[in-house]
Amino acid sequence: MMTSKHYEEFMKMAIEEAKTSLKEGNKGFGAVVAKDGRVIASAHDTEVTDQDPIAHAEINAIRKASRNYRKDLTGCLIVSTHEPCLMCAGSIIWSNISEVIYGVSIRDSIKAGRDMINLSCKEIIKRSNAEINIHNGILKKECLKLYNNDIRKLVRKFRTTKKSDWTIIEEDLLNKRMQWFENNKTMICKLKGNDLEKAYHLILMKIGIKSSEAPIVKKSENKIIFHSKNYCPSLETCIILDLDTREVCKEIYERPTEDLIRRLNPKLRFTRNYECIRPYSDYCEEIITLEK
């Protein structure tokens, strides 16, 4: 008997397929077909790389499963990072798949601003009179990251920028942070505390997080050390693209952050403990110092 644990294991495989899709420049969908606890096929969408508008993850997975097993997929289940669209739901029905498991719903995507046909998989299956069980929301939090607009923008940016050109991304980020500082001077002037404390709260303000998400763990007259645990699109992008966050943060994000806090006091400095940074640690250790 299949359990939620099985569904989650299959979903993890589908998520890896979706990550491969994003690395290739496709749209970030993954699917797995399984029977009796055994994976028959796994696939991701190849619309862009194959220039094929119907090469969705579910259809690619069903085609592979049909070749690997048989045309009639009765007794099989399909696990997808995203709710199957109208076309994929039809393919699931025609292939006689018995169970559908997905993470993110069409409704979720529409709310996030994505263009989707607003017709649920459940409604399509209901109209077909097919007996197919549906389970939704499996590893939804993890699947949502695949369709987050901020993460997708960063994935596109890093995919199309050579490492030798990371300075372009750094310079763009620096300019945006300086502009943000100018646009928010009124609020910034209200920051309380000494220059170290103001710098700490300025970083939190820019990222849009609370102190509980990046608590101060050590404080002295000329240094503040805090541990960031907040949701970070850059971190998720690095995980998807297999980039080393230690390199990315050092080469791209450190100088713009330091230059930002130096607007408060030119003697302020910012760095990280690169031996203690996510995903290699549970948190990122970040350090603000005030030179004498």
Model regions and ranges:
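Short beta-strand scaffold segments in enzyme catalytic cores
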Residues: 29-37
